[in-house]
């Protein structure tokens, strides 16, 4: 029998319903795995007592044949989803001891469906990063190692703890957030399915804000079917979130295994020119194209002419929104407060924010404040918003001709911890292929599609028009079926 912590969400639900094992046994198997691999630093707060209590309640529900859609399934939550009575830090010193008195919309939805929370996962501070190295709790180590090198690798960011937890079999699924690629890029680096829904599909209520017009909850799983199951539980209108879309929750599981014959899939190969993509990833892109052709899809060459400006646009808009959102952390209302004798209010603000924020967060606050200043707002912020509209228009034009778009999730495989740390611009380019869809608010997924020559996982990204999560899953399922001979599992786990 497969180890319980290695079961998928779907297989776990099946086993629980058939009384093959209990939720408590399932949770204990995950706790054992978490304890075994603490060196990866995937979790910052463990909630084992809560998980065991929820598991007992789940087992009682199964005994009475009254189970809900996620009854007894162990999951983890990125530490920017507020959890009532449980520390929520966004991995920043300024919120290190913050305990919210309310529950985020997404975690509440999962609890309402019977989910069991194992803990809160590590992340880049305030979700600002691409390697999970800016956390106040230290960096996360990927469960993966290259075949030719035993060096520790990054799991990607900012949702690196969630990616490491699911990849290392320390959670069946894990919540992440995706602002410019923070679910899809880590999923690519760790061999997972990482899904970002349409902007507004999932409630942002109770999510610690980074960039409000871009932030969206996402999910890490080890299969496309699991992704559809979790999404159906997460999605839903929330009147407490002004950006929440008021629509019925779609039925997504029927997309799995559905034929893609006759689907038109757009491929913007011109985005791969100029040597920015590693050869292994270019090879995977072409092999995935052939795989989809064999499955009956029609491949169409398309152009996204403004996508190349995505990174520049993002690093104006996101820091601008962050500088506004993070102004609330002033040492007065909640969070860290640093005081000294005879200190003025201005000095308290300065010392608190200097002590509470890390270097990357300070960098982005300063960039954001600069581009919003009266002297430069027209030149940077307003111009960036105009180009953002052009990026979205490119996608709209493409979707007039195609049903889905195929792109790599990242231009590189996972890299060594510390390798790109001293050059922020190189780090920012990791989100080259994920940012455009975020700027347009589109649903997208990273699905494992190959291994590099060094044995590291590589992800392909599927993007569809707004609210078309169904076809995203449909194409992702076809890719998954085409590479089922590849084992996306780190050695030793």
From Swiss-Prot:
Q: Enumerate the Gene3D superfamilies for this protein.
A: Amidase signature (AS) domain (3.90.1300.10)
Keywords, in A-Z order: ATP-binding, Ligase, Nucleotide-binding, Protein biosynthesis
Provide GO CC annotations from the record: glutamyl-tRNA(Gln) amidotransferase complex
Q: Where is the active site?
A: 78, 158, 182
Give its E.C. classification number.
6.3.5.7
Write out the GO MF terms. ATP binding; glutaminyl-tRNA synthase (glutamine-hydrolyzing) activity
Q: Mention one GO biological process in which this protein takes part, according to its record.
A: translation
Source organism superkingdom: Bacteria
Q: Which Pfam families did the record assign? A: Amidase
What does it catalyze?
L-glutamyl-tRNA(Gln) + L-glutamine + ATP + H2O = L-glutaminyl-tRNA(Gln) + L-glutamate + ADP + phosphate + H(+)
InterPro entries (UniProt xref) = Amidase, Amidase_CS, Amidase_dom, AS_sf, GatA
* Subunit structure, as described in the record: Heterotrimer of A, B and C subunits.
Recorded family membership: Belongs to the amidase family. GatA subfamily.
The record describes the protein's role as:
Allows the formation of correctly charged Gln-tRNA(Gln) through the transamidation of misacylated Glu-tRNA(Gln) in organisms which lack glutaminyl-tRNA synthetase. The reaction takes place in the presence of glutamine and ATP through an activated gamma-phospho-Glu-tRNA(Gln).
Name recorded for this polypeptide: Glutamyl-tRNA(Gln) amidotransferase subunit A
Tell me the organism.
Rickettsia bellii (strain OSU 85-389)
């Amino acid at each position: 029998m497969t180890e319980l912590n290695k079961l998928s969400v779907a297989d776990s639900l099946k086993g629980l319903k058939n009384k093959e094992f209990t939720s408590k046994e399932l949770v204990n198997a995950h706790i054992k795995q978490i304890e075994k691999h603490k060196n990866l630093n995937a979790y910052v707060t463990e909630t084992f007592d809560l998980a065991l209590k929820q598991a007992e309640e789940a087992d009682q529900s199964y005994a009475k044949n009254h189970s809900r859609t996620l009854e007894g399934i162990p999951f983890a939550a990125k530490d920017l989803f507020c959890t009532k009575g449980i520390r929520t830090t966004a991995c920043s010193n300024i919120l290190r001891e913050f305990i919210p008195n309310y529950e985020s919309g997404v975690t509440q939805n999962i609890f309402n469906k019977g989910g069991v929370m194992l803990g809160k996962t590590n992340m880049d501070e305030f979700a600002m990063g691409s390697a999970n190295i800016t956390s106040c709790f230290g960096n996360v180590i990927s469960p993966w190692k290259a075949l030719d090198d035993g060096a520790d690798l990054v799991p990607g960011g900012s949702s690196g703890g969630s990616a490491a937890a699911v990849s290392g079999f320390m959670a069946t699924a894990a919540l992440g957030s995706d602002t410019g690629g923070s679910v899809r890029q880590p999923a690519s680096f760790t061999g997972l399915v990482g899904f970002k829904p349409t902007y507004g599909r999932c409630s942002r209520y109770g999510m610690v804000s980074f960039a409000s017009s871009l932030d969206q909850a996402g999910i890490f799983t080890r299969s496309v079917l699991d992704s559809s199951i979790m999404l159906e539980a997460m999605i839903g209108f929330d009147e407490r979130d002004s950006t929440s879309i008021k629509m019925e929750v779609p039925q997504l599981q029927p997309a799995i295994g559905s034929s893609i014959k006759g689907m038109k899939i757009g491929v913007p190969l011109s985005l791969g020119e100029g040597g920015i993509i590693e050869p292994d990833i270019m090879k995977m892109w072409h092999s995935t194209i052939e795989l989809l052709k064999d499955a009956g899809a029609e491949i169409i060459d398309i152009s996204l002419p403004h996508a190349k400006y995505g990174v520049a646009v993002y690093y104006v808009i996101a820091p601008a929104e962050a500088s506004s959102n993070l102004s609330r952390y002033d040492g007065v209302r909640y969070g860290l407060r640093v005081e000294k004798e005879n200190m003025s209010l201005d000095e308290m603000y300065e010392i608190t924010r200097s002590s509470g924020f890390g270097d990357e967060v300070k960098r982005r606050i300063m960039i954001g404040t600069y581009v919003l200043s009266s002297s430069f707002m027209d030149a940077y912020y307003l111009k960036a918003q105009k180009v953002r509209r052009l990026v979205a228009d490119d996608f709209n034009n493409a979707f007039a001709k195609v049903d889905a778009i195929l792109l790599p999730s990242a231009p590189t495989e996972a890299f060594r911890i510390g390798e790109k740390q001293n050059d922020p611009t190189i780090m920012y380019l990791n989100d080259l292929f994920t940012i455009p869809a975020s700027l347009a608010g589109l649903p997208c997924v990273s699905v494992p599609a190959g291994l590099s020559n060094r044995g590291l996982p590589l992800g392909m990204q599927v993007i569809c028009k707004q609210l078309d999560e169904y076809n995203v899953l449909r194409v992702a399922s076809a890719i998954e079926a085409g590479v089922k001979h590849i084992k996306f599992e780190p050695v030793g786990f």
